[in-house]
Amino acid sequence: MNMEGPLRPRLVNCSDFQFGVVTTETIENALLHLAQQNEQAVKEAAGRTGSFRETRIVEFVFLLSEQWCLEKSVSYQAVEILERFMLKQAEDICRQATLQLRGKDTELQSWRAMKEQLVNKFILRLVSCVQLASKLSFHYKIVSNITVLNFLQALGYVHTKEELLESELDILKSLNFQINLPTPLAYVEMLLEVLGYNGCLVPATQLHATCLTLLDLVYLLHEPIYESLLRASIENSTPSQLQGEKFLSVKEDFMLLAVGIIAASAFIQNHECWSQVIGHLQSITGIASESIAEFSYAILTHSVGANTPGPQQPVPHKAARALRTAAAAASSNT
């Protein structure tokens, strides 16, 4: 493979994704593995989790991935890699600052220099995360070093190939080379596969395209959507800082996000089958139907506005109780 050749455009076709070609045993094992990873991620939800999924950052990654004709999964993977790397860097800076504040004033410059370097290299790190994510999807297109360097130069950032490789290596080392973790898309596609085997009335391929659009929306409107969920869970329009911190585990629950995305997609595609889809999702994941309905309600409210399942089915208060219980249970485990 020529890593330095020009990157030719490739349109991502949602119909390329095929359902129903994997054995049920493989699906069961994969779903169990995803559920275990999700449970671990929810338990480890920390104070600053989600800080770098800010709308402008996500939009930058999405637009860059589109410009480079990358597959959808690369965009989500890049956002998650960047999120975890930047959090790790921020934690290291805070730890260094705490240690050096106890020392001499001259040593104080060290952590400040680290912070300045982090800010100055942010665009380079972001682009490196996209490039790393593209390498995980090696069956599509890998972004070449020349493509990255030309892009950075167009923005006014001059770097060498060596600096680009060092940036990738810094990210890999910081994350202990653990960058191939599941994104919300993996949960969505796995659940769609199971729905197909369970006889869901809405075809999985039909739901898949809508799920991709709604997943983009949730990433871009991450804060408003989860804020509305938080307000519903506590039945209060002004949550306290403590309540917000306890809700972090819900923000990191990719399985909950996936069922909400699928339920919202089902309502858009065929609202008459909405309740059936929610029932299937509940039996598959064990997540309360009220919680699934509330999440889909929040997504639909921020996407199509009116004509959501809210007026027809009074789910918000029931879902609020379910989400409140989930948040309380998660916080008690931390």
UniProtKB/Swiss-Prot annotation:
Compartments where found: Nucleus; Cytoplasm; Chromosome
Keyword Iron found: no
CDD domains: CYCLIN_CNTD1
GO cellular component, one term: cytoplasm
Disruption phenotype: Homozygous knockout mice for CNTD1 are grossly similar to wild-type, surviving into adulthood and exhibiting appropriate mating behavior. Males are sterile with a decreased testis size. Females are also sterile.
Subunit and partners: Interacts with PRR19; this interaction promotes crossover formation. Interacts with RFC3 and RFC4; these interactions facilitate crossover formation. Interacts with CDC34; this interaction regulates the cell-cycle progression.
The protein's name: Cyclin N-terminal domain-containing protein 1
Native source species: Mus musculus (Mouse)
Lineage of source species: Eukaryota, Metazoa, Chordata, Craniata, Vertebrata
